[in-house]
Regions:
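Gly/Trp-centered helix-boundary motif
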Residues: 1-143, 147, 151, 158, ...
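Membrane-helix/interface signature in polytopic inner-membrane proteins
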Residues: 207-226, 232
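Glycine-rich helix-loop "coupling/hinge" segments at transmembrane-helix boundaries
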Residues: 184-186, 213, 261-304, 328
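Transmembrane alpha-helix boundary and packing residues in multipass membrane permease domains
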Residues: 63, 151, 180-184, 193, ...
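Transmembrane alpha-helices
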Residues: 129-145, 233-263
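Short helix-to-coil transition segments within interhelical loops
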Residues: 113-118, 156, 224-234, 238-243
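Alpha-helical transmembrane segments
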Residues: 202, 206, 255, 259, ...
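Generic hydrophobic transmembrane alpha-helix motif, especially the helices
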Residues: 110, 141, 146, 151-215, ...
Length: 330
């Protein structure tokens, strides 16, 4: 084996040229040369590493554009447009080809005409904006109340006794039945539906958060922090909250699609919104089942509602997985 050692005499350099003295700077020695860690940068790096997430986000962007921007661009008026052809009996329940022949070949009639002679395509996207807005508002309210009360529930033993009894009572009341009764008592509009979906919707979130807080609260490092006199607030923000982020995101991923499903189901059985929504469109399309070509009018809003719920669920679940600090090791 060849000798890999370097002979300094052969370099023809003085000792001063070969070596230089480094000053003992205490401040410099304290500096961390490693790149600064950013939690959310790491989250999105892990999230976008999965190509499926990119596809799902693209679909979500298209859904948002057509649900919220498209109706505003075309000037869709929910009080006028759905009834513009209501007096024309020949404009109702038309297939796409018949609708384009009657009204002109454009994007508005690619899914035909509905029960009132309205554009099914335009109505679906306006209805999507109503359903998505309802789901987002309900999710924000229930998640906010549920996370706050769940955290207190998990920390306070006195509050735990009271809330456990409340949970045992509320959890035994059928959720759909409670929503239906509230909607029947109140005027069936957007905000009454929000009230019905949030009056007890937070209790399940709070119970789940309470369970997670108890699990993390009793870990060894948290017990050691409490023994050392660390304030509860600091333990909650530094030791518990970072581990709860992925749990909260994952829980929200199931909450938002579930409220869209509730709205569609309640509207389909005639107990939902009075405003146009995906459920209302599906309920109105039932009357077209005896007419030729009813499949497009009925299954179009069903397909859009299904795509929206699946996309929101997949994006939320994968974002929740990416939020888990254990996935940031690599």
């Amino acid at each position: 084996m060849a000798d890999n050692k370097i002979n300094l005499d052969n370099l023809n350099m003085s000792e001063e040229e070969l070596f230089s003295r480094i000053s003992n700077d205490e401040l410099s020695s304290e500096k961390i040369t490693a790149p600064r860690y950013s939690y959310w940068q790491s989250v999105f790096r892990v999230f976008f590493r999965n190509k499926i997430n990119v596809v799902m986000l693209s679909l979500l962007a298209i859904i948002i554009i057509f649900s919220f921007i498209y109706p505003a661009v075309i000037g869709y008026d929910a009080m006028v447009d759905p009834f513009i052809n209501v007096m024309d009996s020949t404009a109702k329940h038309l297939k796409p080809a018949a609708a384009m022949e009657k009204f002109g070949a454009n994007i508005h009639w690619i899914l035909g005409a509905g029960a009132s002679g309205e554009s099914t395509f335009d109505a679906i996207w306006y209805g999507s904006s109503i359903s998505i807005s309802l789901a987002l508002i309900c999710a924000v309210i229930n998640m906010t109340i549920g996370v706050v009360l769940g955290a207190v529930w998990g920390f306070s033993k006195k509050f735990d006794i009271f809330m456990t009894e409340v949970y045992n009572v509320v959890a035994n009341v059928p959720y759909i039945l409670l929503i239906s009764v509230i909607v029947l008592i109140m005027t069936p509009n957007f905000w009454s539906m929000v009230f019905a979906l949030t009056i007890t919707g937070w209790i399940g979130v709070a119970y789940f958060i309470r369970t997670q807080v108890i699990i993390i609260r009793d870990r060894e490092y948290n017990l050691a922090s409490r023994c050392l006199g660390t304030p509860i607030g600091r333990i909650a923000t530094k030791n518990i909250l970072p581990f709860m982020t992925s749990v909260i995101v994952t829980l929200a991923a199931t909450e938002i699609p579930s409220y869209i499903s509730y709205e569609v189901f309640l509207s389909y059985i005639g107990m939902g919104l009075s405003d146009m929504s995906l459920g209302k469109l599906i309920e109105a399309a039932k009357s077209a089942m005896q007419t030729p070509g009813w499949e497009i009018e009925f299954w179009s809003p069903v397909a859009v509602a299904s795509i929206i719920t699946v996309v929101l669920y997949v994006v939320g679940q994968n974002l929740g997985d990416a939020s888990d600090p254990r996935t940031h090791m690599s």
